[in-house]
Amino acid sequence: MAYGIVHNFPGGTKEQYEASIAAVHPSDGGLPEGQLFHAAGPSADGWTIVAVHESQESWERFRDETLMPTMPGIEGGLPTPPQETTFPVHNQQTG
């Protein structure tokens, strides 16, 4: 079952996001293995990222093996761990 993740970074900026995404996503501009969707943009209090992975296990593997170990060392990246909301995806549609 697909698995959704919403990350909110209070005080986060576009520049911090771009530095962070360059470090944790493939250099060819694609998505990490198992990720189906990624969107990001400014929110009322900072920066918000929405992702959908093909499964909870896919998300946890990316989080534990790539995202969390890499984030603290990214120069100019998002400086704090996100506020996280996760959910099993009940309905996923694309245009």
Regions picked out by a protein language model, each given a short descriptive name:
Residues 1-50, 54-69, 75-95:
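Short S/T/G/P-rich N-terminal loop/turn motif that feeds into the first structured element of a domain
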